[in-house]
Amino acid sequence: MKTYTKKQRDLKKNLIAWLLVTPSLIFMLIFTVWPVFRSIYLSMTKYKLGMKAPDFIGLENYISLAGSSLFWKVMGNTLYFALITIIPSMVVGLFLAAIVNRKSRATGFVRTAYFYPVIMPMIAIASIWMFIYMAKNGLFDQMLSSLGIKPMNVLSSKKTVLPAMAFMYVWKEAGYLMVFFLSGIQSISEEVNEAARIDGAGTWTIFRKITLPLLAPTFLFVSTIALTNSFKLVDHVVIM
């Protein structure tokens, strides 16, 4: 009967582990690592359709971009959009998570309703909100008229177009962030909350002094996700 030493057994386990991980590593190299390095290389070249091979020009593209006023204008708008969407979407997401965390017969329906905008394509959402913001006949202008306020075409004004898009984005993104906050809230031991209730703490006190501090890691993760998502929106701008 053949016996193996501890070192041989460990080597065998490691070999099996690497064999199991290899397919995932191959896919990651092909579809993640290689495109990143390829994109970096192409950003340092001059390439046009019909050329056999791109001409390497170093950092000229980056220098040209840094000297473009249009680039800095776009960056400013993007940063402004991120600032006016990240905090509101996180606040609304946390509020929704606190609501759906309560046990009731309608909890499943409410969670689905809040999350539904997340699974809708941005093109469809942008089209819906474009009709809402439509001048004169749109739902938003009709609401303003009913309140005695002069209608405004929010999508044609520099002062209102970004806030209008930000409102639409928060409406879509809040349900997505709600899922992470809900997971964080449910990971908090109920014994901690119960002990606080026995000591006479109310719902708001428990939320402010127990739930929020324990959600610090979740806040860090959610803020990173929200920042990343706010920088990669394109389709709604084209449609609206």
Task: Say what each PLM segment does.
Residues Y4, R9-M240:
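A structural signal for multi-pass alpha-helical bundles of membrane permease subunits
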